[in-house]
Curated annotation (Swiss-Prot):
Signal peptide: none annotated. It is found in: Cytoplasm; Cell membrane; Lysosome; Endosome. A motif (PPxY motif 1) lies at residues 346-349. Its main location: cytoplasm. This is Arrestin domain-containing protein 3. Belongs to the arrestin family. GO terms for biological process: fat pad development; heat generation; negative regulation of adenylate cyclase-activating adrenergic receptor signaling pathway; negative regulation of cold-induced thermogenesis; negative regulation of heat generation; negative regulation of locomotion involved in locomotory behavior; positive regulation of hippo signaling; protein transport. Interacts (via PPxY motifs) with NEDD4 (via WW domains). Interacts with ADRB2. Interacts with ADRB3. Interacts with HGS (via PPxY motifs). Does not bind TXN (thioredoxin). Interacts with ITCH. It comes from the Eukaryota. The keyword Membrane applies. The lineage of its organism: Eukaryota, Metazoa, Chordata, Craniata, Vertebrata. GO terms for molecular function: beta-3 adrenergic receptor binding. A motif (PPxY motif 2) lies at residues 391-394. Gene3D superfamilies: 2.60.40.640.
Amino acid sequence: MVLGKVKSLTISFDCLNDSNVPVYSSGDTVSGRVNLEVTGEIRVKSLKIHARGHAKVRWTESRNAGSNTAYTQNYTEEVEYFNHKDILIGHERDDDNCEEGFSTIHSGRHEYAFSFELPQTPLATSFEGRHGSVRYWVKAELHRPWLLPVKLKKEFTVFEHIDINTPSLLSPQAGTKEKTLCCWFCTSGPISLSAKIERKGYTPGESIQIFAEIENCSSRMVVPKAAIYQTQAFYAKGKMKEVKQLVANLRGESLSSGKTETWDGKLLKIPPVSPSILDCSIIRVEYSLMVYVDIPGAMDLLLSLPLVIGTIPLHPFGSRTSSVSSQCSMNMNWLGLSLPERPEAPPSYAEVVTEEQRRNNLAPVSACDDFERALQGPLFAYIQEFRFLPPPLYSEIDPNPDQSSEDRPSCPSR
């Protein structure tokens, strides 16, 4: 008898949303099929699936142990959210010499259904960062006697829903800052900045209306600007590693001495980025809106307003939808492309992004005085769910400047 061959082994998910992307939340049932195509008859010991969800953090730091001694310190941490195994065909027996229990699969295409329930407890949103990731996947393993197993892994996306309609995320965010410039024994007038946004919570694709007033009573030319930043924080062995990513920005008009500029709802659009991750013990993803004044030859005047990027968009006034899935479906279109099937081990960050790309796209910001330098870098943080989409293009110059605000002298004469 001529034994057949395995032509293909694939995994497909039953999607719960209109965009046909496998996206789930805690408590959902993940279901799908393992698709097997064979040419000729084959004998099978077992067809298994293994589903797992986990967050993992890893980075290294160089240490000096003496004048001529150095070593590398590894920091790793992992949190497992679920671990499910099931046998679709056959049994666990590993003895190839035992003829009993082998299954015969005939030539053609075959489907084997699987399903499992995600935990009811909160799950971290799928994410791929500089020093860690949150991944969810299903692996299929086909075991045959006297042959190496055929394995395939496919990821799916999990969103831990954040409803921006909660009172804490609907509250306005505001602040005021002032700075006086000094040069030797001379002191110029102050530069003042006040800014306000209507709420704390937003979803990708929305535009933030920025209300601000910038008053320049110094002797220098200054430029008001705004930027959205993503902060990734990774925790392991009592240590923390932080990376800041620039997401989007805009620039106002230059202000000469004695001038004032008012932003009456200047718009800054949020590109497709990962939602905030606030409930994971080893990975945290937060966002902030930086409204600041670029001052040549001095530290920038910075005002930071916290943001939360959610998954359930703002309800129109007076209307409520009936379910979380329907609320979230309108926000799934920007997922765009499904995650590909993978070999057994998911690719590392370094395998997906070259070292040169990583240096260019993930420039960290270490301090406020590096803020302007960071604004010259790329404007899109690397996110796993959206890594197959081209990065959005943004200009530092606002394409729709507010023409209503005019420079006007407002500082007291000196």
